[in-house]
Amino acid sequence: MTKRTLGGTSRKRKRVSGFRVRMRSHTGRRVIRTRRKRGRTRLAV
């Protein structure tokens, strides 16, 4: 029996909270700006 992979969920994660999705909306850009200010190495997923 084959094991279940996480390919689908990681794709969904990118589509929901990826960098390009964040840059689309005003609030998403605010999230990126805040994370840059805090010095996060990972701005988005």
UniProtKB/Swiss-Prot annotation:
Lineage of origin: Bacteria, Bacillati, Cyanobacteriota, Cyanophyceae, Synechococcales
InterPro entries: Ribosomal_bL34, Ribosomal_bL34_CS
Keyword Ribosomal protein: yes
TM annotation in the entry: none
Residue stretches of biased makeup (Basic residues): 10-27
GO biological process, one term: translation
Name by which UniProt lists this protein: Large ribosomal subunit protein bL34
Gene, per the UniProt record: rpmH
Molecular function terms from GO: structural constituent of ribosome
GO cellular component: ribonucleoprotein complex; ribosome
Annotated keywords: Ribonucleoprotein, Ribosomal protein
